[in-house]
Each structure stands twice: as structure tokens, then as C-alpha cells.
A protein has these predicted regions:
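Generic alpha-helical secondary structure signal
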Residues: 4-11, 29, 95, 154, ...
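Mobile genetic element proteins and their domesticated derivatives, centered on retroelements
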Residues: 1-2, 12, 34, 50, ...
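Conserved, non-catalytic sequence blocks in retroelement Pol enzymes and Pol-derived host proteins
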Residues: 21-24, 58-60, 88, 104-106, ...
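RNase H-like two-metal-ion nuclease catalytic core shared by retroviral integrases
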Residues: 89, 176-178, 184-185, 199-221, ...
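An active-site-proximal beta-strand-loop segment
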Residues: 102, 106-141, 148-149
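Active-site beta-loop-alpha junctions of metal-dependent nucleic acid enzymes
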Residues: 144-167, 183
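C-terminal domain-tail junction helix/linker
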Residues: 20, 192, 219-274
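Basic, flexible linker segments flanking DNA-binding modules
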Residues: 2, 9-108, 261-270
Length: 274
């Protein structure tokens, strides 16, 4: 080996005994934290979210360095899959114009809520999940499980949960697609009883008008649902409930707001009382 490297035997053994460099030690400590954050995210975080979490913990490191360390140990975010649009809008109920117009930026809670419905497969049949999300902090503030697609079992109970969780005290835009659950008289009349609520609907066949809600379902399925095979409806309900209430709504980093939902709300409250 010494002949190949063209160095003396003493120099070679001196190199072997040499202590790791400061940079190597930093990388070792950094990688330990990166791996810990990656595992806590259930292998869903890529370098952007891992970097945000490191910054929160006081480690000011570039995303490029995090990406290199993750790549060196083959730490990859779960591959994302395409999602299926499941809106049924072939009905005769009146629809409203798109007042949101893809403006997903808000300055306070209870300014814009978005909603959508998705399907979850189980061996007992389909389970339908309806969610309502506050655009300010991306929190799922209302949701409902059902075996039926009627508004009484989807949009209406999700709305009732949302208004229990967050009081409407100022003008609120409620945005959804044109699905029958949002256009029907039962749901329209319910929202009209709230004077501060203004309805908004996506343009026909345009999923990007409701991109935040669509993105949530994509995240839910890629990070969680696709890794489970649900035998029963109850099993699926419990699994999705735990994902929303113990991970997504609490600790998950959201790149759109560059923090977790909990931290975003706390920062807003601190600004109000400052």
C-alpha cells in the first residue's frame, strides 16, 4: 500500500492514527440529526423539509449540504405518485364564480377555507374523506368519514367541525370544487346562514383552482395511505385520524409556510400580543 501511494510507512500509519477533522465531525453530527428527522417524518422528508427542521433546531446549514449528506447514505423521500380527480359535477344545482382565483396567500386565520373529498380503498369498500383546510396555516380544521357521498355525511359534518374549531368573526371565503356535495341546496343553505361567509368554486374541470386541498390528499396518500392495506373501514378511519391529528396538524413541516402548523399559529398569536 505504501509503495502504491508513494509514501513512507511511518507517514501512512501516522495518517491512520490522525483524529477526524472538524469538518468530518460536523458532518457526522449533522448526519445523525438528518437521519433522525428523516425517520421521524416516516421517510417522507426530502432535503428541503429536513433543512427547515435543522434551521428550527439552530443548525444553519445549506440545503445543498443536506442533500449531499442524504444522497451519500441513500436517504430519499418517498416517491410521489399521481392522484386521481374524483369530483362529480354533472348536476343541475347552481354554482358560484371562482372568487379565490388561485390566490392562496392569506394574512390571518379564518380568511380562506378550502375543501375537497377523496376516496380511500378498504376490503370492506370505499371510505370517503372530506376535509376543510385553513389556508393560513394549512391546518385540517374540519373533516368527516363516511360510506355515503351525500352532503349530510360529507360536506355538512366537515363544516360543522370546522366552525366548532375556528370561530368566524370576519369575512371568510369558502372555496371548493363544483361537486354536488358543495352545490346542493342543503349545503348552500347552511353556508348562507353565515352572513360573513362568501362561497367560491373552481372552474369546471380545473383541479388547480383547488390546488391546496388536492395537494393535501396527494400528501396523505403518498406519505401514509399507500403504505397500508386496510381490511376494514374502522382500521382506515383510525389510521387516517392518527395521521391528521398527531402528525400533519402538529409536527409536519409545510414548505408553503416554511414551518409546522403549530409554529405558524403560535407565531401569529405572538405578533398579535406583542
Amino acid at each position: 500500500m505504501c509503495k502504491v501511494l508513494n509514501v513512507s510507512r511511518s507517514s501512512y500509519y501516522s495518517w491512520l492514527r490522525r483524529s477526524p477533522s472538524k469538518h468530518s465531525l460536523e458532518n457526522r453530527e449533522l448526519f445523525y440529526l438528518i437521519k433522525r428527522i428523516y425517520e421521524l417524518s416516516k421517510r417522507t422528508y426530502g432535503s428541503p423539509r429536513v433543512t427547515i427542521e435543522l434551521h428550527k433546531r439552530g443548525f444553519h446549514v445549506s440545503r445543498q449540504r443536506v442533500a449531499r449528506l442524504m444522497k451519500s447514505q441513500n436517504l430519499k423521500s418517498i416517491i410521489r405518485k399521481k392522484w386521481v380527480i374524483t369530483t362529480y359535477s354533472r348536476h343541475n344545482y347552481p354554482v358560484v364564480e371562482n372568487k379565490l382565483n388561485r390566490d392562496f396567500n392569506t394574512t390571518r386565520p379564518e380568511q380562506v377555507w378550502v375543501s375537497d373529498i377523496t376516496y380511500i380503498k378498504t376490503l370492506q369498500g370505499w371510505l370517503y374523506l372530506t376535509v376543510i383546510i385553513d389556508l393560513f396555516d394549512r391546518k385540517v380544521i374540519g373533516w368527516s368519514f363516511s360510506r355515503s357521498l351525500k352532503a349530510a355525511h360529507t360536506s355538512i359534518p366537515a363544516w360543522k367541525m370546522a366552525v366548532r374549531n375556528r370561530m368566524i368573526t370576519r369575512k371568510l371565503i369558502f372555496h371548493s370544487d363544483r361537486g354536488i356535495q358543495y352545490a346542493c341546496h342543503e349545503f348552500a343553505n347552511l353556508l348562507s346562514s353565515y352572513n360573513l361567509v362568501e362561497r367560491s368554486m373552481s372552474r369546471k374541470g380545473d383541479c388547480w383552482d383547488n390546488a391546496v386541498a388536492e395537494s393535501f390528499f396527494k400528501t396523505l396518500k403518498v406519505e401514509h395511505i399507500y403504505h397500508h392495506s386496510y381490511k376494514t373501514i374502522k382500521e382506515a378511519e383510525l389510521s387516517v385520524f392518527e395521521y391528521i391529528e398527531t402528525w400533519y396538524n402538529v409536527n409536519r413541516i409545510h414548505t408553503a409556510i416554511k414551518t409546522s402548523i403549530k409554529d405558524k399559529k403560535e407565531k401569529f398569536i405572538n405578533q398579535l400580543v406583542a
